[in-house]
Amino acid sequence: MTYVDTSVLAAYYCPEPLSNKAQQALQREDLLAISWLVETEFLSMLARKVRTREIRAAEGLRVLAVFQAHLEQGIYQRLALEREHFAKAREWLATFTVPLQTLDALHLAVAAMQGCPILTADAALAKACARIGITAHLIS
């Protein structure tokens, strides 16, 4: 199972420079996982693209419908955030040495505690993964 970061989903569902690479990377994986946090971040990203007129509202609704259909089809296994994920994120952040934002620390905690590598288009996140011993596959 591979944990898919929001940055990859953004490139997969919306036209971006990394869209082709995101598609190829997702097709190579057998079992894809996201957390409820990824789903929320994806919707936030989509809303931002509509608000900033990067895409039209109709396109945003189309993308959302496709993503929702994929969720309903079980393309992604949804992972819940649990108390232990917050504790693990807190542990990493308390070292003061791992350059993670709050939500990224939570993503990595979910992936780490599931024993999943993470697929990301975020170079800083991939670098943080290396610091804490999580396998990251960076698309760039």
Q: Where do the PLM segments sit?
A:
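Acidic, PIN/NYN-like endoribonuclease modules and their adjacent C-terminal/linker elements
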Residues: 1, 84-87, 108, 112-140
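Short active-site oxyanion
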Residues: 29-32, 77, 112-118
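Short beta-strand scaffold positions
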Residues: 34, 80, 102-105, 119-120
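Aromatic- and histidine-enriched alpha-helix N-cap/loop-to-helix transition segments
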Residues: 37-40, 84, 103-106
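Acidic catalytic patch
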Residues: 39, 62, 68-96
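Short amphipathic alpha-helical interaction patches enriched in hydrophobic/aromatic residues
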Residues: 46, 50-53, 71, 75, ...
